[in-house]
Amino acid sequence: MLLFIDTANVDEIRAANALGVIAGVTTNPSLIAREGRDFAEVVKEITSIVDGPISAEVISLDAEGMMKEAVELAAIHPNIVIKIPMTTEGLKATRACMEKGIKTNVTLIFSANQALLAARAGATYVSPFVGRLDDIGQDGIGLIYDIADIFNNYDLATQIISASIRHPLHVQQSAKAGAHIATVPYKVLLQMAKHPLTDKGIDAFLADWAKLTPKA
């Protein structure tokens, strides 16, 4: 399973990329708004940092408007993937993008039926929101299992991006459930690298080494 970082903060993206584990970036209007910068400027800078898929989301609600934005965003860099909301208008735009060779990431997926529709419309990726489903008492990881089963049954090429990741266990569970990618906040990425027994082991090694070091 690949790891993307879910942020529009270029400092976080640079730091994550330096770890050598990030294969792409997902953004959305809310994340970019937090940065207080021009949308296209932020997206262009991100493409200069990470050599992989960069998801940038449209804000129009009609298919025609989505397509206009998609063409403009795709022109920024070949790695741009257009994030499109899971609506009937979004499905139309997804199909139109596919026909133009523009990669898409259909977002705000909360059911296997939605994922199937997006795949049939030609989506490159679908993004089921694990954490938001958990928030309302539903099984977010169970949805990843369901989508993976359906896609595998019919050899669908659309890849699953496990999104709305809240903690490291979501990442582990997503990998077991068959997600192709998990897109994680920077904080969660750092948490994945930590374990108290690792820290304890390092402290023990250093203490033992200090015993071998001659005192002045």
UniProtKB/Swiss-Prot annotation:
Pathway: Carbohydrate degradation; pentose phosphate pathway; D-glyceraldehyde 3-phosphate and beta-D-fructose 6-phosphate from D-ribose 5-phosphate and D-xylulose 5-phosphate (non-oxidative stage): step 2/3. This is Probable transaldolase. It comes from Desulforamulus reducens (strain ATCC BAA-1160 / DSM 100696 / MI-1) (Desulfotomaculum reducens). GO terms for cellular component: cytoplasm. Its main location: cytoplasm. GO terms for molecular function: aldehyde-lyase activity; transaldolase activity. Gene3D superfamilies: Aldolase class I. InterPro entries: Aldolase_TIM, TAL/FSA, Transaldolase_3B, Transaldolase_3B/F6P_aldolase, Transaldolase_AS, TSA/FSA_arc/bac. Belongs to the transaldolase family. Type 3B subfamily. It catalyses: D-sedoheptulose 7-phosphate + D-glyceraldehyde 3-phosphate = D-erythrose 4-phosphate + beta-D-fructose 6-phosphate. The active site is at 83 (schiff-base intermediate with substrate). It is found in: Cytoplasm. It comes from the Bacteria. Transaldolase is important for the balance of metabolites in the pentose-phosphate pathway. CDD domains: Transaldolase_FSA. Keywords: Cytoplasm, Pentose shunt, Schiff base, Transferase. Pfam families: TAL_FSA. Its EC number is 2.2.1.2. HAMAP family: Transaldolase_3b. GO terms for biological process: carbohydrate metabolic process; pentose-phosphate shunt.
